Amino acid sequence: RPCLIWMDLRSAPQTEKVVATGDVALRVNSDGRGPVSAEWMVPKALWIKQNEPEIFERAAVVCEYQDYVNYHLTGRWVASITNVSARWHYNRARGGVPETLLEKLGLSDLAAKWPAEVVDLGQVVGGLTARAAEHLALPKGLPVVQGGADAFVGMVGLGVVRPGSLAFITGSSHLQLGISAV
């Protein structure tokens, strides 16, 4: 099936179900209360499971756009820490995958469909495969480095890296992203 890109908001009703769990995983990016965005992975996956269950069951991998591109470049399924932290309620310090949240939503089977390895920004994902190298006219084995969500990477480029700094980012979306001391 065609992917559900970030701006596809059909999973808005599912966000309410995610918030209603009151799960500790919501503290990662929603302060435990919400809001939860329909742009994020868990509501989208819940929407697919509820509305297209045959597709959810057949899916071997459920991932972000970046994971898909990295797979086609390197042959490795990995996830980006910036995406999983912001959109999957992933908390490395608490064991990573938000298992209790997924259980409460009837999505226990989702974690097995996610890329098992989470790679930090700037780490090498792998080398360019022969097929990708030929298609792109680049050298086979060229290192492919993990990126991140555009707005968060843009914050670094704007110098928003210390508490008290703020970035206003506009384009296909509009964001106000800040750094606090807490």
Residue positions per predicted region:
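Gly/Ser/Thr-rich active-site cleft segment
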Residues: 1-3, 9, 25-148
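Short helix/loop capping segments that flank catalytic or ligand/cofactor-binding pockets
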Residues: 14-15, 72-73, 98, 128-129, ...
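Hydrophobic alpha-helical membrane-insertion segments
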Residues: 17-19, 53, 76, 84, ...
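Short alpha-helix plus adjacent loop in nuclease-associated cores
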Residues: 4-21
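Catalytic phosphate/nucleotide-handling subdomain of diverse soluble enzymes
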Residues: 134, 138, 142-182
